[in-house]
Amino acid sequence: MGSWRLLFSDSRGVVYDHPELLAAVRSGDEQLAPRERPTSLPAGARLAMLPGRRPVGIDPDSGAPVVLGEVKVGRKRFVPNAVAATLPPGWTRTLLPASARHPLAFGGDDAPILPQWAYTAAALGADGPVAFAMHTDRRGHWSVETHSTEDLPERVAERLASSDNPIWTQLSRCALEWSCFTAQNTFYLRDEGAIPASSGCNARCIGCLSEQQEGMPPSSHERIRQPPTAEEMGEVAAEHLANARGRVMVSFGQGCEGEPTTRWREIAKAIRIARERTASGSIHVNTNGSLPRALGALFDAGLDACRISMNSASPDLYDAYYRPIGYGLADVVRSMRVAKEKGGYLSLNLLTFPGVTDREEEAERLCRLVADVGVDQVQTRSLAIDPDVYMDVARERGGAGRPIGIRKLVAELKRARPGLVIGNFSRAMKERASR
């Protein structure tokens, strides 16, 4: 049992450490003492209060979990809230924050559903706050220090003044209001630039970033209202591919939209427009993989890479989270095969959740899929969702068995597919040869 101290906060979000209790962590539904070492809180990470959640610590004498009740700090008495870390790009959560729902503090029948963040277990170590996470992509071009810079508003204003293309209006909101790094790159003219393409979707994901049902927390993004034309998309794509510096690519399929391949005809035309103007850079799509024929048509038009998202290789758990309309997991796997048949670079956007994704049978199914299809890269994406909401979906679904841990899951994936790239960011054309 480690010596990391329990963190808790008051109602204003001021964080304290407990003088006696040690930190507990969560894996699935289980709250326990951590069995792995944490890392110092990464640059760009933050500590966040979990409203309506009591902190859960470990009694250092008995080793048993303890729900923290009313505390006294100085002259102040209050009911504490649990604390979690939120991580910067390039990091993957390995454990969840331990907590207990506490409805009484809100005068209602239930605690509020938490906003959409990838809540990570945190504690206090000897040298400061720590988080239970692993550094899965060390490339520095997605650093928080190089985004949301002081000159960004001016860059956005200049672009909006010079073009009436409505894509720039959407990207300006993404860049400034929601701090989307991919959208910001389009204004910085570097690396991966964003091209939102679709306002509609053929899935109803429980953790959708751009459209949530009534009673859920507000979406972290607002979906593009008017789907852009092929000409509008082609214009933005061509300019970025021709003029950007660094690891240059454009990607269709962003957090501010639905499923891009539902507009595959327009995107295919946009790709051809861009390629008529420049041969530079990479053209990429982020997709749920629901439409294999549509994806194949995009590769025929000039697409060279895709990232297909999934939370599980188990059909029942996949369906329960994505709530697909008119397709299933078998179609997603077919899309993966299409990408490889067309010579594309295939990334799997794996939505990870400690205690579910790393269950023994879940891990085995994922490893078989990655090896069988020939996935080039797995991007480990910590699922941004209230942990209790996801467990309601996953508790009785998916593969069984004890969790092996996110770190071991990553190691097993690499063993199953020699040469597999593990990371968090899409690879540009020049980065793919060294698979």
Region roles according to the model:
Residues 255-257, 288-290, 311-313, 351-353, ...:
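Active-site beta-loop-alpha junctions enriched in small/polar residues
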Residues 264-280, 329-346, 398-423:
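Alpha-helix-loop-beta-strand connector modules within alpha/beta enzyme cores
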Residues 192, 196, 212-269, 275-294, ...:
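Core AdoMet radical
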Residues 293-300, 355-372:
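Catalytic cores of alpha/beta
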Residues 167-191:
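Short, charged low-complexity linear segments at domain edges
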Residues 201, 205-208, 252:
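Short cysteine clusters
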